[in-house]
């Protein structure tokens, strides 16, 4: 009987190799490594051909963690207990691949703007964050606001003026 230490290491499946190669070729992983270096991170190999960058210092972007290609960038240290957040960020690495690399940035920005318009925050209606799992990424799910006919952004209606002149024009 072989122990876990004696068992041969299993190589990650082919899909992870495809993702790693694709994100390297579309230049998103090199960009992620550059961002992590500029951000003062320590970088180490992670699971499933990912890179884990730890100790990101700049204030932007405003997130506990973010992903660029196959590089998962975190403000703190990645630990084995971060399974939900790791899975969330790993899903973003697949999104980088499907968006052909740097095209992800303007698409994500548009999705973030749409989410802010519809919910008042950047994640609740963001198709990329919803696909990666809102709760796993630490985002609350906010309700949708009306787009049209609900008054100003935020869905608040403005009451009509109540001066005597305004009432006389309305026929009341």
Listing of model-derived features with the role each one plays in the protein:
Residues 60-67, 71-86:
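Short pre-active-site segment immediately N-terminal to the catalytic Zn-binding motif
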Residues 84-96, 132:
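Active-site recognition of the HExxH zinc-binding catalytic motif
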Residues 67, 89, 126-128:
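Hydrophobic transmembrane-helix microenvironments that flank and shape a buried ionizable site
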Residues 76, 94-95, 136:
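Activation segment
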Residues 2-56, 60-62, 100-172:
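Metalloprotease/metallohydrolase-associated module, dominated by Zn2+-dependent proteases
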Residues 81, 97-98, 102:
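Membrane-helix interface segments
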Residues 72, 92, 117-118:
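Residues at structural and domain junctions
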């Amino acid at each position: 009987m072989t122990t876990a230490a004696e068992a041969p290491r299993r190589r990650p499946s082919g899909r992870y190799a495809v993702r790693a190669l694709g994100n390297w070729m579309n230049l998103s992983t090199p960009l992620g490594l550059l961002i992590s270096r500029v951000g003062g991170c320590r970088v180490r190999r992670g699971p499933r051909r990912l890179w884990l960058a730890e100790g990101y210092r700049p204030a932007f972007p405003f997130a506990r963690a973010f992903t660029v290609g196959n590089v998962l960038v975190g403000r703190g240290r990645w630990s084995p207990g971060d399974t939900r957040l790791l899975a969330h960020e790993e899903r973003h690495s697949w999104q980088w691949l499907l968006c052909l690399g740097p095209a992800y940035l303007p698409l994500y920005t548009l999705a973030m703007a749409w989410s802010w318009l519809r919910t008042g925050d950047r994640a609740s209606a963001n198709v990329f964050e919803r696909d990666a799992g809102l709760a796993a990424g630490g985002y609350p799910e906010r309700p949708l606001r009306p787009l049209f006919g609900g008054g100003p952004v935020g869905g608040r209606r403005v009451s009509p003026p109540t001066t005597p002149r305004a009432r006389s024009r309305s026929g009341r």
